[in-house]
């Protein structure tokens, strides 16, 4: 009270001698942002924060979207370390990159995605720009659609899709819709529902497709299903917008993972494509990605490139150099590229092995449920089919953290904790 009283006295004295001070204090106390509400927490980051606070030695974080080794530790690829050493030895400068990014990186990215002998590359009827990882590629693509896709503002996403797809396209001014994709009854691909919904999409709309390792379900169409989807997309004159964040990381074979993209192009469908090197090179914090537009001819590609640069310039001017140099060094050095391909396969194989071990351990626990979908799904993520109330029990009783929809990151499962996970899942689902 004494302090409060003295504060009032001092304030009064200051006002008496300096009337302007009171007005200044009042001005400082007012706010421009009183109307701004607290935003909701990110669901995945919220899982990580809760995990960090848990003191249980057996705790598991199955929400994180980053690869972990079999000890549960972050993994830097040896090929990345070698590339970094080679770059450091060159003593390169830190000058700005061009607006479109590192030229050799862009060329190598297009070759990785489309195949080195692809007709599109030989004819030059494409443009690839370096972006700030996959998210940046999506945003550049969304903004390009908003400005130049004059036919429609409608973008159709698979249901469900990566959570960031909606705000990226919505904030770029596009209208979001969905088509059936995941079947919760089978924990697999709703092929019939997808075809039915795609057939009803208005002509000249945009359809977003996950090239491989669908996030969050881990459910991918088979090649024969992709063929039917491509036929329908072409027949209905839809624009195919591919998101490929996991090339090589899904099956362990980069060509296999890019099959859908290449098939669509072979069928005469001019697509656009987003790439990320976060997962398949472990360059999460380097933010390395690319955005490619396949065009009618080389002249059209030049015009599209000029407008992509105009979009990029006020957004971030030009992309960062370090990650692009790492990726480019790996992709353009035959020995490093071969080593990297083996390392990517090793990461993919570990995740596939963890899926198999989890199902095997569930059977050992005596689970009567059919867990085949865990093995059938592909990539980092798995839609387990576990219900929200069961997820809550896993967290409270076993310190196992995941998103409420039952999605787990298989990268967080190791040979040391897979048995514990299987036991916990059995306990809450029996």
Swiss-Prot record:
Chief location category: mitochondrion
Cofactor(s), by name: pyridoxal 5'-phosphate
InterPro entries: Aminotransferase_I/II_large, Asp_trans, NHTrfase_class1_PyrdxlP-BS, PyrdxlP-dep_Trfase, PyrdxlP-dep_Trfase_major, PyrdxlP-dep_Trfase_small
EC number: 2.6.1.1, 2.6.1.7
Reactions it catalyzes: L-aspartate + 2-oxoglutarate = oxaloacetate + L-glutamate; L-kynurenine + 2-oxoglutarate = kynurenate + L-glutamate + H2O
GO cellular component: mitochondrial inner membrane; mitochondrial matrix; mitochondrion; plasma membrane
Subcellular localization(s) per the UniProt record: Mitochondrion matrix; Cell membrane
Any GO MF annotation of the entry: L-aspartate:2-oxoglutarate aminotransferase activity
Transit peptide boundaries: 1-29
Domain of life: Eukaryota
N6-(pyridoxal phosphate)lysine, modified sites: 279
Any GO BP annotation: biosynthetic process
Residue numbers of Phosphotyrosine PTMs: 96
Modified residues (Phosphothreonine): 48
Signal sequence, renumbered to the chain: none
Pfam families linked: Aminotran_1_2
Residue positions, PTM Asymmetric dimethylarginine: 313
Entry binding sites for substrate: 65, 162, 215, 407
Protein family (similarity comment): Belongs to the class-I pyridoxal-phosphate-dependent aminotransferase family.
Function: Catalyzes the irreversible transamination of the L-tryptophan metabolite L-kynurenine to form kynurenic acid (KA). As a member of the malate-aspartate shuttle, it has a key role in the intracellular NAD(H) redox balance. Is important for metabolite exchange between mitochondria and cytosol, and for amino acid metabolism. Facilitates cellular uptake of long-chain free fatty acids.
NCBIfam families, per the entry: PRK09257.1
Binding partners and assembly: Homodimer.
Other comment: In eukaryotes there are cytoplasmic, mitochondrial and chloroplastic isozymes.
Full protein name: Aspartate aminotransferase, mitochondrial
